[in-house]
Structure formats: structure tokens, C-alpha cells
A protein has these predicted regions:
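Glycine-rich, charged/polar anion/phosphate-binding loops
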Residues: 24-33, 73-78, 135
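Short, flexible hinge/linker loops that cap or flank conserved catalytic cores
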Residues: 37-39
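Phosphate-binding active sites in nucleotide-utilizing proteins
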Residues: 43-104, 111-116
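Cysteine-nucleophile active-site neighborhood
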Residues: 96-167
Length: 167
């Protein structure tokens, strides 16, 4: 690990949290016209969690709860729509390509997410969650399946695993 892990850089990145601007919310509100929820506001963060979306850092979810978010889990595979009380969506990593056919078959969920995006709901998709937000995704069977259509594009299978690393 000593030869491949830059501990000093990781510590510097961790210190960035302590160096927040005094009022980043105000800048974002002016830029987007959206008021960010305050700690006392109830903000329901709907988090996709099932066989297709299963990679989350628990400390991130705990940090969001500490900032006032109420985390509510839902399943893009098994539920018909996002939770009605959702104020924002988090679609984490996982293996949507392994479940592409089943995700595509759940048209009511895909429509629910597309409509939420169209209304301006904050949505964060990372890794597999981002792939689910695309127009279509190539499944493990190499067929192409419709996804949510929030972003234009097609997720395709590569010949090998991509690189992973720090910021």
C-alpha cells in the first residue's frame, strides 16, 4: 500500500470538508433559483436499493441524515414508482447491466424517474445509477434495453473493466 496509496493526498482531501465556504447554499440558490432545504426542513432522499443498485458508502448516507435528510429506500426492479414523498433521488452503483431486461420491463418506474427529472427533482446517479438514467443500456446478453431517458446516450459493454481510483 505504501507504494500505491497517497496517504498525504487523502488527508488533504479530507480537510477540504472543513474548508467550506460560508454560504455555498446562497450561491447555488442564486444560480439555480432553487432553495436548498435547511436542517430543520424535512428532505426525503429516495435511495435506490435492490439487486441492481447496491453500492453505497454508509458514511455518506449517515452524513446526509445528519444534515436533515430522511433516507427512504425503494427498488427500481420491484416497485412501481419512486416514493411519493421523495424530494430527491440517489441511484448508486451496482450492476444494472445484469438486470437490464427486468429494469426495462418496469416501465412505470422508468417513467416515474423521467417525470421527476422533468419536474426538476434533484437526481444523482453514480456508476450503475448513471447508466440507468441513460436512454438505453446494453445488457449482459448484448441486447439493448430502454432505460429512464433522463440523459441521451447508450451505456455499452466494454472489452475490459475500466480504471478505478481517487479524485
Amino acid at each position: 500500500l505504501e507504494t500505491t496509496l497517497d496517504v498525504e493526498q487523502l488527508l488533504k482531501l479530507a480537510e477540504l470538508e472543513e474548508m467550506r465556504q460560508e454560504s455555498p447554499d446562497k450561491d447555488l440558490e442564486q444560480e439555480t433559483g432553487r432553495r436548498l432545504p435547511k436542517k430543520q426542513d424535512k428532505f426525503c432522499l429516495a435511495v435506490a436499493k435492490d439487486e441492481a443498485f447496491c453500492f453505497y458508502y454508509q458514511e455518506n448516507l449517515r452524513a446526509m441524515e445528519a444534515e436533515g435528510a430522511v433516507v427512504q429506500y425503494f427498488s427500481p426492479l420491484h416497485d412501481k414508482a419512486i416514493p411519493e414523498e421523495a424530494d430527491g433521488l440517489l441511484l448508486g452503483g451496482g450492476y444494472p447491466e445484469l438486470y437490464a431486461k427486468k429494469l426495462a420491463e418496469n416501465e412505470t418506474m422508468r417513467t416515474s424517474i423521467f417525470q421527476a427529472a422533468k419536474r426538476g427533482m434533484p437526481i444523482h446517479g453514480e456508476c450503475g445509477g448513471y447508466l440507468y438514467l441513460l436512454e438505453q443500456l446494453q445488457g449482459e446478453d448484448e441486447a439493448y434495453y430502454p432505460m429512464c431517458g433522463v440523459f441521451s446516450g447508450t451505456g455499452i459493454k466494454g472489452k475490459r473493466l475500466g480504471n478505478f481510483g481517487y479524485i
